[in-house]
Amino acid sequence: MSDLAATQLPLLPLRDVVVYPHMVLPLFVGRERSIQALEHAMTGNKQVLLVAQRHAPDDDPDVDDLYQVGTISTILQLLKLPDGTIKVLVEGSARAAIEAIDADESFSMATVRSLECEDLEAESEHEAVKTTVAHFEKYVGVSKKVPSEVLTSLSGIDDPGRLADTIAAHMSVDLAEKQNILEMSSVKARLEHLLSLIHI
């Protein structure tokens, strides 16, 4: 795994969700520190670090309650709701490891380093992708939780890493398992792991 330069970003802990690169989703934010982090991001490049917390009920998670790998994400849209909460639309861009967290009274900043994903060899890549997609199609066929449109979206994805993350996002597995996949920088390992989960 080769590492890229470190950077500082506002930290946004998430309950019960892991965000992958290229994933676009709405989040409803009510915690004051998280709102402050978002507002700070909006004054700059609109980037934040989204990281899952280990225990969803914790209102003020400390460093030990956060996973150490999150996703650098861009705020696409932010809407302040009448009840004081915020609805924000985010798009994940890159996996990142947390090196340090600087918490002040308002919000936390994380020093993070993007994790560059290891590419597959072309032949190995083609086989791994083909096998994983074929098994995922069967999974979608028997699962009531995955919309069939997901398969249509997969056909338009050329990048194996992005394809693996898209499949992972739609798997009915627990938070710890989704986090485990996020922490895998090897695309081959991700595809193989997804295959093992689909076989369960």
Question: PLM features: residue spans?
Answer:
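N-terminal low-complexity, acidic/polar interaction/targeting segments
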Residues: 1-198
